[in-house]
């Protein structure tokens, strides 16, 4: 059963209600739990930070069992195109879609750039750049009002679908590198919300320890 959880932001005791579960874009339309939540704060002046959005991260821990024991399991999950994932951003101020796309694209470009020439090829790099341009173009002339939710969801084949207020915007984009770089923005070592990433990493590690391995008497776990 999905409940609404309060995530506080700002200095006036305000909060945003975030669903305890979210339907993924996988074939089973799995009802994934909230792994962790947090607040994106952006520095706009030397002594001034503003809250931009509240985020919720959703996926099925049982789908991540293969990454147990890795140095950074959460980052591995972010870059695993076979694991369906969703992030839900609820904005606490009015913003333009272009400004959101630009900010996220900067992080994606950093991730893609850091991998250039390492295990990739010119064709895949070109494809990823084209996918990024498609991503940015979706937000042209889009206005995101306070209280609006923006979700980024990937399925098991590395296809990204974006929804604003529950309605799909633009075309779905199939590019594993883009999807990985996007989710690394919140799940990687250079996360824009490090407190949430640390919490999510800890929660995932604990959850993986409780999930039996698939080869445990040949029986897998149904734990979520």
Regions found by a protein language model. Give the residues of each.
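Terminal leader/tail segments of proteins
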Residues: 1-164, 168-224
């Amino acid at each position: 059963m999905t409940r609404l959880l309060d995530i506080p932001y700002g200095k006036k005791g305000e909060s945003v209600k975030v669903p305890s579960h979210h339907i993924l874009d996988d074939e089973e339309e799995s009802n994934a739990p909230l792994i962790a939540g947090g607040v994106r704060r952006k520095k706009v002046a030397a002594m001034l930070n503003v809250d931009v959005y509240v985020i919720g991260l959703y996926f099925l821990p049982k789908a991540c069992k293969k990454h147990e024991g890795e140095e950074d399991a959460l980052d591995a999950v972010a870059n695993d195109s076979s694991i369906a994932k969703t992030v839900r951003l609820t904005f606490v101020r009015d913003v333009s879609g272009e400004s959101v796309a630009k900010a996220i694209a900067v992080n994606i470009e950093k991730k893609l750039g850091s991998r250039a020439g390492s295990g990739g090829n010119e064709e895949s790099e070109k494809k990823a750049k084209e996918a990024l341009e498609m991503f940015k173009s979706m937000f042209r002339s889009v206005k995101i009002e306070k209280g609006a939710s923006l979700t980024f969801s990937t399925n098991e084949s590395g296809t990204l679908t974006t929804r604003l207020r529950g309605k799909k915007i633009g075309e779905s984009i199939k590019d594993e590198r883009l999807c990985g770089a996007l989710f690394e923005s919140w799940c990687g070592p250079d996360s824009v919300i490090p407190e949430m990433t640390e919490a999510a990493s800890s929660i995932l590690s604990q959850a993986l320890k409780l999930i039996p391995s698939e080869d445990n008497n040949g029986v897998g776990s149904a734990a979520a």
